């Protein structure tokens, strides 16, 4: 599943094409991509067609478009928008008109930029159909103004409003394993299996260490490493292990060549030379160094 860096790469890639552009046509080509919408395709089309995109936002693994033309305003910007979740394999691709059809295209929109007199298409491609688009209303919360469907999603590590020490204190109150806490999107969002393993390796913390056994200083250091790892991944276009994650131009990221723990089982630890091991963890796997990452 795309994690924070991959979704942020998509957001940044969409911005020069979509920001300030008007959505002139919408075609829904697979019902699962709009499964959360009671009014179906008609509701999605009505909420998007003729609207201008004024901002592209993100929290954790969620994207959203803020749209003009709905009259009411909330939190200082238009009240209505579009929420996007990429699921396991979702892609937001910028295409010229009359591009060859993709077998897993689920939604097609036509976008017009009046300033550049450009017309192109934005496709939602999703092989496994776990992703979705949905109209949304923005609401004010204690953690900022966000789409109503994701008010329970916490700030992420790249959110400029995140207070790292406050988050460290919150995490320390949890008795669960530290990796399980990092994966809880209601505590801190955007972290999945890849970046949890990488930030724990960087901070020399065993993934099954109870969060309450770590000091605020250790947890703050862990979160700082997480920020560094994610920024490094952003610089390299995210992590791609197959063709399911690509940027808006269909290009894969290459952070996978910089991974120290995730997927490195049997390989020498880049820090101490011991073999990285893989263990089952909560219906997935953890990758860590048994020498560098001791249980606290």
Curated annotation (Swiss-Prot):
Matches recorded under PROSITE patterns: FPG_CAT (PS51068), ZF_FPG_1 (PS01242), ZF_FPG_2 (PS51066)
GO molecular function: 8-oxo-7,8-dihydroguanine DNA N-glycosylase activity; class I DNA-(apurinic or apyrimidinic site) endonuclease activity; damaged DNA binding; zinc ion binding
EC number in record: 3.2.2.23, 4.2.99.18
Keyword Cell inner membrane attached: no
Family matches, as Gene3D superfamilies: 1.10.8.50, MutM-like, N-terminal
BP GO terms, sorted: base-excision repair
Keywords: DNA damage, DNA repair, DNA-binding, Glycosidase, Hydrolase, Lyase, Metal-binding, Multifunctional enzyme, Zinc, Zinc-finger
InterPro entries xrefs: DNA_glyclase/AP_lyase_DNA-bd (IPR015886), DNA_glyclase_Znf_dom_DNA_BS (IPR015887), Formamido-pyr_DNA_Glyclase (IPR020629), FPG_cat (IPR012319), MutM-like_N-ter (IPR035937), Ribosomal_uS13-like_H2TH (IPR010979), Znf_DNA_glyclase/AP_lyase (IPR000214), Znf_FPG/IleRS (IPR010663)
CDD domains according to UniProt: EcFpg-like_N
Cofactor binding note: Binds 1 zinc ion per subunit.
Protein origin, superkingdom: Bacteria
Zinc finger (FPG-type): 260-294
Keyword check for DNA repair: yes
Signal peptide: none
SMART domains the UniProt entry points to: Fapy_DNA_glyco, H2TH
Active-site positions on this chain: 2-3, 61, 284
Residues annotated for DNA binding in this entry: 104, 128, 174
UniProt catalytic activity: Hydrolysis of DNA containing ring-opened 7-methylguanine residues, releasing 2,6-diamino-4-hydroxy-5-(N-methyl)formamidopyrimidine; 2'-deoxyribonucleotide-(2'-deoxyribose 5'-phosphate)-2'-deoxyribonucleotide-DNA = a 3'-end 2'-deoxyribonucleotide-(2,3-dehydro-2,3-deoxyribose 5'-phosphate)-DNA + a 5'-end 5'-phospho-2'-deoxyribonucleoside-DNA + H(+)
Functional note: Involved in base excision repair of DNA damaged by oxidation or by mutagenic agents. Acts as a DNA glycosylase that recognizes and removes damaged bases. Has a preference for oxidized purines, such as 7,8-dihydro-8-oxoguanine (8-oxoG). Has AP (apurinic/apyrimidinic) lyase activity and introduces nicks in the DNA strand. Cleaves the DNA backbone by beta-delta elimination to generate a single-strand break at the site of the removed base with both 3'- and 5'-phosphates.
SUBUNIT field: Monomer.
Family: Belongs to the FPG family.
HAMAP family for the chain: Fapy_DNA_glycosyl
Name of protein: Formamidopyrimidine-DNA glycosylase
Organism: Corynebacterium diphtheriae (strain ATCC 700971 / NCTC 13129 / Biotype gravis)
């Amino acid at each position: 599943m795309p994690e924070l860096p991959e979704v942020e790469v998509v957001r940044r890639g969409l911005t020069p094409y979509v920001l300030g552009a008007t959505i002139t046509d919408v075609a829904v080509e697979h019902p699962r991509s709009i499964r959360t919408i009671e009014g179906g395709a008609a509701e999605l089309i009505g909420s998007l067609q003729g609207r201008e995109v004024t901002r592209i936002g993100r929290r954790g693994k969620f994207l959203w478009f803020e749209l003009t033309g709905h009259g009411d305003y909330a939190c200082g910007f238009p009240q209505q928008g579009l929420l996007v979740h990429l699921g396991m394999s979702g892609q937001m691709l910028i295409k010229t008109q009359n591009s060859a059809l993709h077998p897993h295209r689920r939604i097609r929109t036509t976008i017009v930029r009046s300033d550049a007199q450009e017309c192109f298409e934005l496709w939602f491609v999703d092989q496994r159909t776990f992703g979705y688009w949905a109209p949304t209303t923005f609401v004010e919360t204690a953690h900022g103004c966000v789409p109503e469907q994701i008010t329970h999603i916490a700030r992420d590590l790249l959110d400029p409003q995140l207070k790292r020490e406050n988050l460290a204190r919150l995490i320390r109150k949890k008795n669960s394993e530290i990796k399980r806490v990092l994966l809880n999107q209601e505590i801190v969002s955007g972290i999945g299996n890849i970046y949890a393993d990488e930030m724990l390796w960087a901070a020399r913390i065993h993934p099954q260490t109870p969060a309450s056994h770590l000091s605020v200083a250790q947890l703050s250091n862990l979160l700082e490493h997480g920020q560094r790892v994610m920024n490094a991944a952003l610089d390299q276009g995210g992590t791609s292990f197959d063709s399911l994650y690509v940027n808006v131009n269909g290009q894969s990221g290459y952070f996978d060549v910089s991974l120290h723990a995730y997927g490195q089982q049997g390989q020498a630890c880049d820090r101490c030379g011991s073999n990285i091991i893989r263990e089952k963890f909560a219906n997935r796997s953890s990758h860590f160094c048994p020498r560098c990452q001791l249980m606290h």
